[in-house]
Amino acid sequence: MAQKKKSSGSGLMSSAGLMTYYDADKKAIHVQPKTVFIFGAICGIVILAFSAGFGLWP
């Protein structure tokens, strides 16, 4: 049977790259999932209200 070769450096390089990416990501805007859910619910309610108000309700 053929044996698989283990690459010793690929895992370390991969994790180091991810750590660098997440360190740089700290400057980004962070939004909580609850905020996104509430914003989506409000947008949905507003769209339904406009649809009902203009006679487009199914």
Swiss-Prot record:
Residue intervals passing through the bilayer? 33-54
Q: Which residues lie on this side of the membrane: Extracellular?
A: 55-58
**Gene Ontology terms: cellular component:** plasma membrane
Keywords tagged on the record? Cell membrane, Membrane, Protein transport, Translocation, Transmembrane, Transmembrane helix, Transport
InterPro entries under this entry?
Preprot_translocase_SecG, SecG/Sec61-beta/Sbh
Q: Name one Pfam family in it.
A: Sec61_beta
Q: Where in the cell is it found?
A: Cell membrane
Membrane topology is: Single-pass membrane protein
Which stretches face the Cytoplasmic side?
A: 1-32
Q: Name one GO biological process term.
A: protein transport
- Function description: Involved in protein export. The function of the beta subunit is unknown, but it may be involved in stabilization of the trimeric complex.
Q: How does it assemble?
A: Component of the protein translocase complex. Heterotrimer consisting of alpha (SecY), beta (SecG) and gamma (SecE) subunits. Can form oligomers of the heterotrimer.
The protein's name is Preprotein translocase subunit SecG
> Which organism is the protein's source?
Methanococcoides burtonii (strain DSM 6242 / NBRC 107633 / OCM 468 / ACE-M)
Gene coding for it: secG
